[in-house]
């Protein structure tokens, strides 16, 4: 069996935990945002269709809309015209940041950029913090190897 060119999912759990901690999102919220990212515009039925797969929360749509993760693209006017929504700039940035981290960008380790590096954090945050440091070290080594291989080819 041929292995993929890049091992994108190796640190998926660490990246997901970091994004949830940084942006105050739950697992279900993040899953829905990732699903809706490929949908340019969506209606409430589209949202509810995917929301059936994640943990149940009555007001999830309203909450995500109020918190600025979803914005109204077009208001519904009358019985035949339904409202359309789109992911906000904030939600789009989160998804793009996830892709960048999966492609090898390092997770920041400064106190101002990463809440898991504060002093008064949970044990879980400390465990993930150590894994972030390992992941960043791995990504640096991987980039160094790629650079030296490229120099050898030239």
Predicted stretch roles:
Residues 112-143, 150:
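Terminal interaction helix/tail motif
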Residues 89-123:
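Short, amphipathic alpha-helical interaction segments positioned at domain boundaries
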Residues 39-51:
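Short acidic, hydrophobic short linear motifs in intrinsically disordered regions
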Residues 65-79:
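A short, conserved structural fragment
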Residues 2-32:
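Short alpha-helical segments that sit at the start of domains
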Residues 52-67, 82:
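Short amphipathic alpha-helical interaction segments
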Residues 34-38:
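Short, locally clustered residues in the helix-turn-helix/winged-helix DNA-binding domain
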Residues 21-26, 75-99:
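Short, cationic-aromatic polyanion-contact patches
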């Amino acid at each position: 069996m041929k292995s993929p060119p890049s091992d994108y999912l190796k640190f998926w759990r660490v990246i997901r935990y970091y994004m949830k901690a940084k942006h105050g999102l739950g697992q279900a919220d993040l899953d829905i945002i990732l699903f809706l990212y490929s949908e340019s515009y969506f209606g409430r039925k589209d949202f509810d269709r995917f929301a059936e797969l994640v943990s149940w929360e009555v007001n999830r749509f309203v909450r995500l809309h109020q918190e600025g993760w979803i914005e109204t693209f077009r208001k519904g006017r009358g019985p035949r015209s339904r409202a359309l929504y789109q992911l906000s700039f904030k939600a789009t940035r989160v998804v793009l940041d996830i892709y960048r981290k999966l492609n090898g960008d390092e997770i920041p380790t400064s106190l101002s950029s990463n809440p898991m590096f504060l002093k008064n954090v949970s044990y879980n945050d400390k465990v993930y913090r150590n894994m972030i440091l390992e992941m960043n070290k791995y990504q640096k080594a991987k980039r160094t190897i790629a650079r030296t291989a490229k120099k050898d080819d030239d």
